[in-house]
Amino acid sequence: MKVLVAGGAGYIGSHICVELLQANHEVIVIDDFSNSKPEVLGYIKDITGKDVKFYEFNILDEKKTEEVFKENEIDAVIHCAAFKAVGESVEKPIEYYTNNLTTTLIVAKMMKKYHVNNIVFSSSATVYGDPEVVPLTEDCKLGETTNPYGASKAMMERILTDVQHACPEMSVTLLRYFNPIGAHESGLLGEDP
């Protein structure tokens, strides 16, 4: 399977790339290193012995994003590309909404145009806001988000589920995790803001 990992050099994305490569999938990465570092790609190779096919740009560049979809017969997308800092999102809400929502719209548009019907979206537990009940389960209702980052993630989820309702052949998986921590067992990959 050929999998596009948007934000594949980031903390979560790089771990996903390792798992995909170790499972013998072809991995294509788009990343602009705004939340990551170029050396992560070397660490992925050190761990797996395999290269990813890499494109350096922000998915906001729709023409370049379309070139990636044109050049590769992509089977699935794992969308981890987003601005991610809660505090910064409060200071820069316009930048967060512009980046996070527009990249998701572009990815969804390209998926539809190039008949890519599988997406896993890296969302966040922030979509629950201040939850009424803990621990949270998948059945908990979404709350009033408490910051622009969480609101953007909730909107990104809505975009993808609306597209899925319009295109029933599309499979959308939403991952709502809390702050991931730790490092890969190799010690090469870990959170490094």
Task: Give, region by region, the residue ranges found by the protein language model.
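N-terminal Rossmann-like NAD(P)+-binding domain of SDR-like oxidoreductases, especially those catalyzing
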Residues: 1-185
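Short, intrinsically disordered, charge-balanced linker/junction segments flanking boundaries
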Residues: 190-193
